[in-house]
Amino acid sequence: PMPMRHGLTLAEAARYLNRECQIGADLHWVPMEGYRRDSFWPEHGRPWIPPSPNLPRFEGALVYPGQVLLEGTMLSEGRGTTTPFELCGAPYIEPMALLNELEKFEFDGLCARPYRFEPTFQKFAQQSCGGLFLHPTNPRELCSYRFTVAMIGCIARLWPKQFAWRQPP
């Protein structure tokens, strides 16, 4: 098992798993010049190269450790939009009701605003969805995992008949 948010580079994660799972792979890697663990990507002065078609922006990568939990629900994680993982919702969600419920919590490093969107593919394709647009404001304080767990709980309480977990294949 790995933590949802671990702070390892891909090479470090590979070395860890190779050792802990006794895989025995002969790993080789090239250290990245100028990399500093205490820095965020924009501080390296290099362009953002999406690690996935669903993470086209650095901001999406910041909220991904929490928002990826939505893949296990029948909530849209924003796939089929230009800002996956920064957007989330479902047709039955009233954005302001959700935002009001979330105001009971304190979330540093993140501003959520009510939003309507229409995914072009994936969950709720071609349907108007109510939800939130997430704006990371301070990456060093942001805990997207905590936010998403609270948001899922709020949605399940506010719309218990509509909210559902995805069934395994």
Model-derived features: positions:
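Conserved anion/nucleotide-ligand pocket segment
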Residues: 1-65
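Hydrophobic alpha-helical scaffolding
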Residues: 3-7, 88, 141
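Electropositive phosphate-/nucleotide-binding environments in soluble metabolic enzymes
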Residues: 7, 11, 81, 145
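Alpha-helical scaffold segments in soluble metabolic enzymes
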Residues: 12-16, 86, 101
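Short gly/pro-enriched beta-turn/loop segments at secondary-structure junctions
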Residues: 22, 78-82, 127-129
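Structured core elements
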Residues: 28-29, 86, 133
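Active-site-lining helix/loop region of Rossmann-like oxidoreductase modules
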Residues: 47-96
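Conserved functional hotspot residues or short segments at active or partner-binding sites
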Residues: 89-169
